[in-house]
Amino acid sequence: MKGIRSNIPRALNAGAKVPCVDNTGAKVVEIISVKKYRGVKNRMPCAGIGDMCVVSVKKGTPEMRKQVLLAVVVRQKQEFRRPDGLRVSFEDNAMVITDEEGIPKGTDIKGPIAREVAERYPKIGTTASIIV
């Protein structure tokens, strides 16, 4: 997994319900924990763009509901700054369901994704239609 050059603020707390924007059948997922999160004692884990999270499917097809899966944050409302000075924010928060290696389980991603996600997870970048 490649490092992200931008300093991404972690805007999504554990317990947040986030829409899933791929065609796997999941509509809304809840963040359970964040992979490779290092925080202090008793601090709730939080995620930002490009972070892989353990999620539970709350709304979706009956086969997908109540499953515990991995997902990557591809959009967040919280503004973040790129090294060239550009500030980027999206209209909504969004996640894509993946496997351990970051390969998306769906074949289509709705809406734009951040360039930082495409750099860290190239397979998500090839699946996405728009990269911002």
UniProtKB/Swiss-Prot annotation:
GO cellular component, one term: cytosolic large ribosomal subunit
SUPFAM superfamilies according to UniProt: Ribosomal protein L14
Superkingdom of the organism of origin: Archaea
UniProt keyword list: Ribonucleoprotein, Ribosomal protein, RNA-binding, rRNA-binding
CDD domains: Ribosomal_uL14 (cd00337)
Transmembrane segments: none
GO BP terms: translation
Keyword Iron assigned: no
Gene3D superfamilies hit by this protein: Ribosomal protein L14
The keyword Cytoplasm is annotated on this UniProt entry: no
InterPro entries (UniProt xref): Ribosomal_uL14, Ribosomal_uL14_arc, Ribosomal_uL14_CS, Ribosomal_uL14_sf
One Gene Ontology MF term: large ribosomal subunit rRNA binding
Sequence similarity: Belongs to the universal ribosomal protein uL14 family.
Its job: Binds to 23S rRNA. Forms part of two intersubunit bridges in the 70S ribosome.
Record-linked HAMAP family: Ribosomal_uL14 (MF_01367)
Subunit-level organization: Part of the 50S ribosomal subunit. Forms a cluster with proteins L3 and L24e, part of which may contact the 16S rRNA in 2 intersubunit bridges.
Protein name per its UniProtKB record: Large ribosomal subunit protein uL14
Protein source organism: Methanosarcina barkeri (strain Fusaro / DSM 804)
